[in-house]
Amino acid sequence: MLDAVLEDWTTADVPKETHAALSLLECMTLRPMELDASFVEGLRESGLDEFKMREAAKVCFQYNLITRMADAFDFPVLEGKQQARLTKMLNFGSTRLRGKNADPLWTRSADGRIRPTGVDRGWQTMLSTKGLTDPPLRHDVAAFVTAQWRLSHKDIPQLSDALTTYLKKLSLYAYRILDEEVDALRAEGYTDEMLCEITVVGAFTAALVGLDQLFDVLYD
């Protein structure tokens, strides 16, 4: 069954509920803005309750985050203190992502979006914690990435051409990022460590779009 799903999940002979879960994953990943009330109702009719939707969505969020970083992190591996600092940067939200058992299922974030409480806690920490990049830049990165998916042309931060190109690809098709585009950022003064911080924030924010969309439909 797994081979059939990997070849083409839309025609694979899988249970109706599994098919619905796969359709949710695809929509969150490729067409998050199409995730509306009618789409969610179709999932319910196929046997997915809110718990199953939430669990599938959390898996999808982490998949989209990890794959973007894997596609983007194609420059030399850092060593020594640099690697230790990067590890800290990648992990600084990990305990917050897990949250506490007493946490509510969702929270309305400072940006007005509804999302899992632990995920929002990790995201807010990622934007504000001390790093080599300034928090205002990280907020601009997050706003720019969100705008790529939501097709918003209002209040988009003005970024350099090199950073704009990089973040557009990171948002929509990270596998297309070129070495030359990373080099252009280095030429602007970004170190590899700073690029890693920007990439983590951008990938996290892009992965949030589908998750936010689902939670808005479920709980707003």
Question: Where is each model-derived feature located?
Answer:
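Hydrophobic alpha-helical segments
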Residues: 1-220
